[in-house]
């Protein structure tokens, strides 16, 4: 359907009807369904930092290091279930690898 047009106040024609101002309604709870809250994102990042990577994530990282992107995708798909999740995990692991190579990772720095 098309969006309703402003009523003209006339009782004949396409836009017939009484002129009213639209009420601004609060967003429905369903509109935020599936969105991750800031707190949840923070907690997940904290847990990742403390716990480290899962064994399958380490394997994906190793495969990406040697340039076996397709094999890394297959491993991720086998563990995560869907192609979409696997692609996202592969991208996440490759970004972690890039950060480590650029010196952004804390594990690569040596202490004296």
UniProtKB/Swiss-Prot annotation:
Compositional bias of type Basic residues: which residue ranges? 79-88
What does the similarity note say? Answer: Belongs to the eukaryotic ribosomal protein eL36 family.
Region (Disordered) spans which residues?
Answer: 79-112
The record, for PROSITE patterns, names: RIBOSOMAL_L36E
Gene encoding the protein:
RPL36B
- Composition bias (Gly residues) maps to 102-112
The record ties this protein, via InterPro entries, to: Ribosomal_eL36, Ribosomal_eL36_sf
Q: What is this protein called?
A: Large ribosomal subunit protein eL36y
- What GO cellular component entries does it have? cytosol; cytosolic large ribosomal subunit; cytosolic ribosome; plant-type vacuole
Q: Which domain of life is it from?
A: Eukaryota
GO biological process assignments: translation
Native organism: Arabidopsis thaliana
Q: Which GO terms describe its molecular function?
A: structural constituent of ribosome
- Matches recorded under Pfam families: Ribosomal_L36e (PF01158)
Question: Gene3D superfamilies under this entry?
Answer: 60S ribosomal protein L36
**Keyword annotations:** Ribonucleoprotein, Ribosomal protein
């Amino acid at each position: 359907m098309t969006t309703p047009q402003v009523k003209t106040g006339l009782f004949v024609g396409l836009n017939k009807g009484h002129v009213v101002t639209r009420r601004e309604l609060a967003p429905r709870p369903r509109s935020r369904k599936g969105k991750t809250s800031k707190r949840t994102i923070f907690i997940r990042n904290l847990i990742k930092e403390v716990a480290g990577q899962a064994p399958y994530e380490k394997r994906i990282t190793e495969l990406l290091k040697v340039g076996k992107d397709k094999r890394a995708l297959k491993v991720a798909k086998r563990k995560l279930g869907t192609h979409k999740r696997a692609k996202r995990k592969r991208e996440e692991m490759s970004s972690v690898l890039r950060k480590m190579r650029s010196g952004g990772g804390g594990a690569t720095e040596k202490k004296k």
